[in-house]
Amino acid sequence: MLFLVEKKVILVYNVFKLLKILKEVRLMEATAIKKVVAMGIGAAIYIVLSRFVAIPTPIPNTTLQVTFAFVALMAFIYGPAVGLGIGFIGHTLNDISGYGNVWFSWVAAAAFFGLATGFLGKIVKIENFNGAKIVKFIVGEVIISLISWVVLAPIIDIAIYKEPQGKAFAQGVTAALGNMIVVAILGTILIFAFSKTIVSKGSLKQE
């Protein structure tokens, strides 16, 4: 029991170290290297959150993931390509390390969520994230979640893995509902908090 507690403490510590590095990465100039570094660190945090901060549901092999609130934040900060990479790489490596095989249907859903949320970030803009922008974000992420887990994941499950339609769509609907709620609450909080660290253009006055 003590070993498990120590293990989780170490994991939390490592996540905070990665977040600190991400903060430094954000200050780098907008280059391809910056995005690759953000993608790699984001994928590592994705795996930790998926493995240790997942909430079980009554539907088999389906959990509620706080991970996607983090993916939404990263996609808003770094754009669609980074969101896509974190979703794809993070979910793939998490499947391999946790289950020994990759469910490409759910990898595709995670990757699409990151990609689409990145484009949503370009429309909504992270600066001054409040009021109408929060409403647009929530509406957008609900639509993206529905496409990701009620359309993409079940259809690929049925087409490639020959999963029963009822089971595939039950898993998809459960995941979509859970993820859209988590992202609407925690994702909004994370993006709002981050937006407060950004200095708006024209907000600095010359002394």
Predicted regions and their residues:
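Loop-helix junctions at membrane interfaces
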Residues: 2-207
